């Protein structure tokens, strides 16, 4: 049993894998036709996402230049700016890394970059997920407790800073668990095949299972639940107010009618949650399946595997289209 191995046995096992496993023809991954298609699509989405997110940032910059010099970005535009930066970070790190890694198949960049890029990859995945949570929370508070939000002008900045901070902290373990392994060729040389993996970083199998579940929860389950709850609260509040006074949609004690901008941002947050769910669900379904059944790799065809993973790259492409349509 894997979970009964002692640390000494585990270390010896890792040592043998790191130096003496012979390479046999057909036992190592290669760049297949479906892999080449994945690489092509990945770099195409990379160009689209870079153009879309950069264009939105430039549009925000032009918008601020037309306003008074000392006038700050509105609360919503500040949130969208940081979400765009997070999406751009994910685009510039995750997509090229995935594309190049699929081309080279093995890892040539050394131990240090193995750890650093693994950290940056997860950091750039946490950031946009947490920023969408911040936007959902902010919009929910703006609709359900508008007076409290107006009286606390620093709340949005605090949540933005917290999102970036948590992203950097939660990605920290990547610096420890990722490392290089070297498989030996027939002559005993360890230059045969190198890979950047988490192999033998966890003393027990359930440690890795727990870490994977924690990452999955923070990247997908918890953000999705928060977005759903926030949108449900917004819809419930608007519906209740509408039933109280069909002619005047008033929020709590406010004398002003609900501006169209708030209804527009409600639609935008719903669109965010929908895009997040559609783009990331196939990716995580495949990942969870693999956690419980590692042999599924041999049963799921290569094209299906690549197709599911490509879905995740659509999210940073869709987000700028969504907030570009609803906000500017």
Curated annotation (Swiss-Prot):
Give this protein's Gene Ontology molecular function annotations: G protein-coupled receptor activity; peptide binding; protein-hormone receptor activity
- The answer on whether this UniProt entry bears the keyword Transmembrane helix reads yes
Disulphide bonds annotated for this chain are 114-196
Q: Could you tell me which Pfam families the record lists for this protein?
A: 7tm_1 (PF00001)
Q: Which residues are glycosylated?
A: 18, 102
Q: Where does this protein reside within or beyond the cell? A: Cell membrane
Q: Name the family the entry cites.
A: Belongs to the G-protein coupled receptor 1 family.
Protein name (database record): Gonadotropin-releasing hormone receptor
Top-level taxonomy: Eukaryota, Metazoa, Chordata, Craniata, Vertebrata
């Amino acid at each position: 049993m894997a979970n009964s191995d002692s640390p000494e046995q585990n270390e010896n096992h890792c040592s043998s894998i790191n130096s003496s496993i012979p390479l046999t023809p057909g036992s190592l991954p290669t760049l297949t036709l479906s892999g080449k298609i994945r690489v092509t699509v990945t770099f195409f989405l990379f160009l689209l996402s870079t153009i879309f997110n950069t264009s939105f940032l430039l549009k925000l910059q032009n918008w601020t230049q037309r306003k008074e010099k000392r006038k700050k970005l509105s609360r919503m535009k500040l949130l969208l700016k940081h979400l765009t930066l997070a999406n751009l970070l994910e685009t510039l790190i995750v997509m090229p890394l995935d594309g190049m890694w699929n081309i080279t198949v093995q890892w040539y960049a050394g131990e240090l970059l193995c750890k650093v890029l693994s950290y940056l990859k997860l950091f750039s995945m946490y950031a946009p997920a947490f920023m969408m949570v911040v936007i959902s929370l902010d919009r929910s508070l703006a609709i359900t407790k508008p007076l409290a939000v107006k009286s606390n002008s620093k709340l949005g900045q605090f949540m933005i800073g917290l999102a970036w901070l948590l992203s950097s902290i939660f990605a920290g373990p990547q610096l420890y668990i990722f490392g290089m392994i070297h498989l030996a060729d027939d002559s005993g040389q360890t230059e045969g095949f190198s890979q950047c993996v988490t192999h033998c970083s966890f003393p027990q199998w359930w440690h890795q299972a727990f870490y994977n579940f924690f990452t999955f929860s923070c990247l997908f389950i918890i953000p999705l639940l928060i977005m759903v709850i926030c949108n449900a609260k917004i819809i419930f509040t608007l519906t209740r107010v509408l039933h109280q006074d069909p002619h005047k949609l008033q929020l709590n004690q406010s004398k002003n009618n609900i501006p169209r901008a708030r209804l527009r941002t409600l639609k935008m947050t719903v669109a965010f949650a929908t895009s997040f769910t559609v783009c990331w669900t196939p990716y995580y379904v495949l990942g969870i399946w693999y956690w419980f059944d590692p042999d599924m790799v041999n049963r799921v065809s290569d094209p299906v595997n690549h197709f599911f993973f490509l879905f995740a790259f659509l999210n940073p492409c869709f987000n700028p289209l969504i907030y570009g349509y609803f906000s500017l």
